């Protein structure tokens, strides 16, 4: 069926399982199970099958294509573009329409679906009845929508393809098709205007714009490698056709306005244009050619009449074409993509026209990463900036008390005999925890984790070293010209950098481990006393003589005791606040807020993968929950400064008022050593816990490092095996080429006279090898085409030595034509 408009052909595809790739990706990258989305997996495959089988112009295909396209846009924010399935599509234009192009790319799939939507709209316009005004209006609408989808594809989809588009989807091809669709839509409007009997001037303006659209489409088509010459000729003919039609209609307007000279000029130009269009008659269809012939007949008749009337009656001067006013353009079409294409994401929902979004309950992988980033940032704020600062302040306060020999000096005065209750409670706590043995077991556990980390790290380093040695050996063996791949350190620069970083972690951690072990050795004697019996404590702490306490000393001791009690209350309050802060952080769940933010990002930025960095504003807002805790740290520091000043002043007054004897001084020293020993015990426990957490976290890093090293070494060894195979093949071919000159030399030696042939003896035929072809030398391209070489054959067959069989002789058997194997082979 021929027509005066062109229809864009569909692209074709094979059935592939998108659900299998999505299932595999969810299994490996998400914390959710694929069976939670069993229905969605079935639906996505069904939508694809329905979409790729839209190959006929029927309006039902529109909903199938736009629904699947909307889901693809939605999936673009859930999954990476290279989801893991090769989408095969046959081109619609060009010279390779029988060979599919496959890409592991969701956007490539979306681009093909939208292209088929363009084809469907154009074929619907082709199939409607364009002999009626309503049919022309419907066809124009279809063509404008097709051009709009094409513009959306070119401007919004293909730039994010992350790969080279197919040949028939390059910019020149799509620009040409878009202008062609607009030209045909404008042509439908022009045809409707003719049927409705609009004024000739209006019809002329419409026709002029049709000509412009066809001209632009043809210009782009010439620069495309996919648009066929037949289509280019069609657009060229249409361009001249409507240029002629515009001038013809303008000439009728001139006749009506009695501009007889201008009428003749425009008819002459119309005739020139229609003749230009008829130059394409060999390549255009009968319908277009018939329209051109009809226009030419009308123009020719009117031109004869106009020239005769003007020459005989009106005698108006005929202006040259350069003086004719350019016909104004009336553009009645525009590229308008349907909202189901441009706003597809907003139309997905519970009551949306395009159905529910698939995999809506699947949390994007970036959200999981963002959640871990927030958790790390929150924990760092809580544990280091707030709790860590409180612990640092408490340590400074304890150091102050230790430097002032408190509370040992006060305890020695208040209780000259026996053990202070505080000391007894500290010793009981350490005994219940099996203090010294607990420290040793903790150090041994930490050492085991450290050894495992070191073993995994060494395994990865040894793999890298082995691969580097293999690569260097092959490079020395084959030379840098043939072994031209990157050296190991350049190919795995990130792995080598990671190895150096991990080695630095071990070095710095070893210094910390040595410091903790030194602390344990220095305090081991005191720990033995504290974990012993009360009898051991009493023997360690000497008693002083009980003496009357002067009123001034008693007054200052009470004051100092009050300051120490305030310090104890301060420490206990900080412990409670630290625990409350940990509970607050534990219940700080940002997942719901992240889900809302992810949904907003998916709606506002479809086809854009969500990145963890997009949640930064949410993180900052959520971390404001801890502003009051940060202010609390400042208040604690201010209060500690005041208490520290009070302790110093009270201790100075106490020291001036109290001068004890030698036994009192020894008791003070012993009590202070035990108090400091208890504090050192707490400090070492904290240090060991920090070290254990460090090595547990490091285990994940070195494990990932080792796995990456294994993958890299495997890939490099496979690559090395392939390179060695290529080198061996090239060497074999080179040795074959080197042997050919010797064969030629041997074949050119003079043949010795033939000897009499002995019966039943195998005869060695002389070499009759033809000269070997010389290697083709690559010459630079020349402007003129090269003449194809013609094969040459010898005119005469070389003579064969007697008794030598040649293929031309055929196979003949003597006697009865049978061969007896027992008699052997004889030549006669």
Curated annotation (Swiss-Prot):
Residues 748-761 have a biased composition (Low complexity). CDD domains: BRO1_ScRim20-like (cd09241), V_AnPalA_UmRIM20_like (cd09236). Signal peptide: none annotated. Residues 4-397 form the BRO1 domain. Residues 789-798 have a biased composition (Polar residues). PROSITE patterns: BRO1. Residues 762-774 have a biased composition (Pro residues). It comes from the Eukaryota. Pfam families: ALIX_LYPXL_bnd, BRO1. This is pH-response regulator protein palA/RIM20. It comes from Aspergillus oryzae (strain ATCC 42149 / RIB 40) (Yellow koji mold). The gene is palA.
